[in-house]
Amino acid sequence: LKLVTGINFRHTDGWRNTDMQWDQNQLKPGSTMLTVNRSSNYTLSENLEWQVNRKLNLTAEGTYYERWVMRTHGPWKYLPNDFYYRNYTFAAGSRYKLNRRNYLTADLSYGRYGYFYDYKLKDITDYFKDGDRITYYPGQRIKQSIQQQVLAQVKGIFYFGDRHILNTGIEYQYNRLESPHHIAGDIASVYTLAAYAQEEWTATSNLILTAGVRGTQHKETGLNLSPKVSALYKAGNFNLRASYAMGFKAPTIKELYYEHTGSIGGSSLTAYHGNTDLKAQTSQYTSISVEYAGSKFQASLTGYANFIRNMIELVEIKVTPEEKLLEIEKSKKYTNLTKARIYGMDFTFNYRPTKYIMLGGGYSY
């Protein structure tokens, strides 16, 4: 039995680069806003590991986190609130050895992430309840969002002789977001269910082939299949690799449903809009690489191409008359772009001329 307790605390008084601030399409002097706000946070953690017997190993962990962000009030912005964050997570896992090298794992985790406003000044909002405008007062802590996530995984690794390794598993992920005034109906949720299988075949002492497929069912985007194949050929000190994979990225719960307004670093006040019509982002990725591993010198050269469809990006849209009344200067919405192509090359090397000296470098294009 092994227990590990962790305590971490951080604090900054904040700092700023300039007293200039962008406000109402003008750069104005005399601002009291900081580039980095004054803040404090701490994390408590507990980890448990129990080797029940030769076959079964159990783990558990939990964390608790709080953070306070203090904002300065003054020209040119009325900042009635500070920020407060409170998170906690729990996780449990197990690993069970079957015969020989085969084993099963099962993991379950839960996380809750809270974001609040701590009011220090009176704030007459643009929200209404029962026909009355909502007003907040100093000392109130008002929930902005509570995000909860559940992740469950079961995986099995199976060896068939000395040449075949089968990796299979299923995953379930559930996300729930509660955010008054920022989501229609105040609450939204999505789920993802996935299953996968991958076979690694050592065809010869020099050649290893891998093939797999992953199927994903998402609440909003439906079913998607993502195959993958790769090959590794060993020739003396050289390794030659080639791979092809189809990728899948479902839109996040905030990209789908969340609506909010904010300003980053004194920039323009911007409205951000989720989009329930988003499609899943898909990609086709291929790469070829050559590696050399000598006693003193190692190097790797990789070329790759990635063809992306329905890429999810924030796109600027026209500011509505209602947003202009709220002094919003920009408006952006999560949108699927038609296509994107990415080509690149990576080169890295390491050289050890003596026992005590090692040189290394790299270049990416």
Regions from the language model: what does each represent?
Residues 1, 42-46, 86-92, 108, ...:
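Hydrophobic, lipid-facing positions within transmembrane beta-strands of outer-membrane proteins
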Residues 2-19, 55-74, 108-112, 116-123, ...:
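Surface-exposed extracellular loop regions of Gram-negative outer-membrane beta-barrel proteins
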Residues 12-25, 29-45, 49-105, 110-148:
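Flexible loop and strand-edge segments within Gram-negative outer membrane beta-barrel domains
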Residues 15-22, 62-65, 70-78, 116-125, ...:
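Outer-membrane beta-barrel translocator domains and adjoining extracellular loop/strand segments
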Residues 29-34, 73-81, 89, 93, ...:
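Extracellular loop and loop/strand-boundary signature of outer-membrane beta-barrel proteins
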Residues 53, 161-165, 171, 175-309, ...:
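Structural signature of Gram-negative outer-membrane beta-barrels, strongest in the C-terminal barrel
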Residues 162, 202-206, 303-307, 326-365:
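Gram-negative outer-membrane beta-barrel transporters
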